[in-house]
């Protein structure tokens, strides 16, 4: 139980630091807060609504991982390093892919809701 409690505190601390230090995290939390009520309006089924919220949460997860990679890379060196630059670019690409995927989920859900598909 103590291990679970410590993990919970670490989770809270990590999320709090990310919120304080990264605008993208704050923006994605706003998107997640907006997604909650919108998903229930747009979702044709309960499961579709859950999927819509989950895909936005997934973007937040990927952004947190990308932020962790960037912070670690910046800690290793502040000098320009092409390999670290490529690693950061890959993290950014992961966020981009997650955003496109989320956008497609929402687009198809809206199309389904209005009867286009």
Task: Give residue spans per PLM region.
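Hydrophobic alpha-helical transmembrane segments
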Residues: 2-68, 76, 80-82, 88, ...
């Amino acid at each position: 139980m103590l291990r679970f409690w410590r993990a919970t505190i670490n989770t809270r601390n990590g999320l709090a630091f990310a919120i304080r230090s990264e605008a993208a995290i704050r923006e994605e939390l706003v998107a997640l807060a907006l997604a909650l009520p919108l998903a229930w309006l747009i979702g044709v089924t309960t499961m579709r609504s859950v999927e819509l919220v989950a895909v936005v949460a997934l973007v937040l997860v990927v952004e947190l991982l990308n932020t962790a990679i960037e912070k670690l890379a910046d800690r290793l060196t502040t000098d320009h390093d092409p390999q670290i630059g490529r690693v950061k670019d890959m993290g950014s690409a992961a966020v981009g892919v997650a955003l496109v995927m989320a956008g497609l989920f929402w687009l198809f859900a809206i199309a389904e809701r209005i009867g286009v598909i």
